[in-house]
């Protein structure tokens, strides 16, 4: 039986693509294994999916770009994780390893290279993350959402892989109930901060609720169930599944962080969006780079976090609604989206060519 290993975790963004690809391999008769951290979100997501996947937990350490004594301890964890991953490679004997990145992916990627297992890696951001910089050295091929320097010869630019499209979804009954609380004469804003919500958006909506709901209908996906409410011109919910696409359809403008997965979903849907990226003090600056790229391409408006005030938001909303046709045209003319089916075909073809 053909066998494939997946790895990636730490955030939902490092797991989502794996969860889209795994069913396709299973359908074609592959035995699927996953290497991650049993205490990580990757284990939770695999369990929730109900997919027939064998999960292997290994030790891992956080990769830091700054000096910390914790780096020493985590270095030993990574080394132990490599030995654990080597044992898994010898036991499973997979045809390939596919990595979506995140620090948990480093031990299995290195172990796969040492074992002679072909390694395929996906990078979502404009600048390659630290884990994937290591993975690139071990990779048979790396697939990139953004164009990368030609000097990186193992990289293939494939665009963003997403199952989202611009097709309107069916309207569930709950959406009709929400719409009854909204004012048809006001624009609808949707605040979304990624898989765990964004505290800055939650605080902004809470602190400015009265004024915001005078000017807009507000949807706030919070990641915090204690904030759940449905009232006049306001809907706040911790998490949504079946409602996600209908709520996106309902929104006139989406206010989002700058994570690659989310903004490319918005591009695929051709949704007007304002990007409020995480600053360099809270990240490696990848969201700022992603936002700048989207602004340069004419897909979005960028609003710095310190400018997220009532006045700053209103100016950004007015700008994007005033020039909405220009933004719509730029998004609809883009060629940066690849379907899951198309990417699966590319990956499977490369795996077949890479078999020894």
Curated annotation (Swiss-Prot):
The keyword Cell membrane is annotated on this UniProt entry: yes
Entry's EC annotation: 2.4.1.227
Catalytic activity: Mur2Ac(oyl-L-Ala-gamma-D-Glu-L-Lys-D-Ala-D-Ala)-di-trans,octa-cis-undecaprenyl diphosphate + UDP-N-acetyl-alpha-D-glucosamine = beta-D-GlcNAc-(1->4)-Mur2Ac(oyl-L-Ala-gamma-D-Glu-L-Lys-D-Ala-D-Ala)-di-trans,octa-cis-undecaprenyl diphosphate + UDP + H(+)
Localization annotation: Cell membrane
Domain of life, per lineage: Bacteria
GO cellular component: plasma membrane
Transmembrane segments: none
Annotated metabolic or biological route of this protein: Cell wall biogenesis; peptidoglycan biosynthesis
Enzyme kind, highest EC tier: transferase
Gene Ontology molecular-function annotations: undecaprenyldiphospho-muramoylpentapeptide beta-N-acetylglucosaminyltransferase activity
Pfam short name (any one): Glyco_transf_28
Residue runs in coiled coils: none
Xref: CDD domains: GT28_MurG
Topological relation to the membrane, as annotated: Peripheral membrane protein
Record keywords: Cell cycle, Cell division, Cell membrane, Cell shape, Cell wall biogenesis/degradation, Glycosyltransferase, Membrane, Peptidoglycan synthesis, Transferase
Chain positions recorded as UDP-N-acetyl-alpha-D-glucosamine binding sites: 195, 287
Biological process terms in GO annotation: carbohydrate metabolic process; cell division; cell wall organization; lipid glycosylation; peptidoglycan biosynthetic process; regulation of cell shape
Main location: membrane
PANTHER family: UDP-N-ACETYLGLUCOSAMINE--N-ACETYLMURAMYL-(PENTAPEPTIDE) PYROPHOSPHORYL-UNDECAPRENOL N-ACETYLGLUCOSAMINE TRANSFERASE, UDP-N-ACETYLGLUCOSAMINE--N-ACETYLMURAMYL-(PENTAPEPTIDE) PYROPHOSPHORYL-UNDECAPRENOL N-ACETYLGLUCOSAMINE TRANSFERASE 1
Function: Cell wall formation. Catalyzes the transfer of a GlcNAc subunit on undecaprenyl-pyrophosphoryl-MurNAc-pentapeptide (lipid intermediate I) to form undecaprenyl-pyrophosphoryl-MurNAc-(pentapeptide)GlcNAc (lipid intermediate II).
Family affiliation: Belongs to the glycosyltransferase 28 family. MurG subfamily.
Protein name: UDP-N-acetylglucosamine--N-acetylmuramyl-(pentapeptide) pyrophosphoryl-undecaprenol N-acetylglucosamine transferase
Lineage: Bacteria, Bacillati, Bacillota, Bacilli, Lactobacillales
């Amino acid at each position: 039986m053909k066998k494939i290993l997946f790895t990636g975790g730490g955030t939902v963004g490092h797991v989502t693509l794996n969860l889209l690809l795994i069913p396709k391999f299973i359908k074609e008769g592959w035995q699927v294994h996953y290497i991650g951290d049993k205490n990580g979100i990757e284990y939770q997501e695999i369990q929730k999916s109900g997919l027939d996947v064998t999960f292997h937990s290994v030790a891992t350490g956080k990769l830091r770009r700054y000096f910390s004594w914790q780096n020493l301890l985590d270095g030993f964890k990574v080394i132990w994780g490599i030995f654990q991953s080597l044992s898994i490679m010898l036991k499973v004997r997979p045809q390939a390893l596919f990595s979506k990145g995140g620090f948990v992916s480093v031990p299995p990627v290195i172990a796969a290279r040492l074992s002679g297992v072909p390694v395929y890696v996906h990078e979502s951001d404009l600048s390659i993350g630290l884990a994937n910089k290591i993975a690139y050295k071990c990779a048979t091929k790396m697939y990139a959402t953004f164009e990368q320097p030609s000097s990186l010869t193992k990289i293939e630019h494939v665009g963003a892989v997403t199952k989202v499209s611009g097709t309107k979804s069916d309207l569930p009954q709950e959406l009709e109930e929400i719409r009854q609380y909204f004012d048809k004469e006001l624009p609808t804003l949707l605040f979304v901060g990624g898989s765990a919500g964004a505290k800055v958006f939650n605080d902004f909506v809470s602190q400015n609720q009265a004024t915001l709901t005078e000017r807009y209908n507000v949807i706030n996906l919070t990641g915090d169930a204690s904030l759940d409410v449905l009232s006049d011109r306001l809907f706040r919910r911790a998490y949504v599944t079946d409602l996600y696409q209908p709520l996106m359809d309902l929104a006139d403008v989406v206010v989002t962080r700058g994570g690659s997965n989310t903004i490319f979903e918005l591009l695929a849907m051709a949704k007007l969006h304002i990007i409020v990226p995480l600053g360099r003090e809270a990240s490696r600056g990848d969201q700022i780079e992603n936002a700048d790229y989207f602004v340069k391409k004419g897909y979005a408006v960028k609003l710095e976090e310190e400018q997220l005030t009532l006045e700053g938001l209103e100016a950004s909303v007015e700008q994007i609604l005033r020039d909405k046709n220009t933004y719509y045209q730029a998004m609809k003319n883009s060629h940066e989206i690849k379907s899951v089916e198309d990417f699966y075909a590319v990956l499977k073809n490369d795996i077949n060519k890479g078999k020894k």
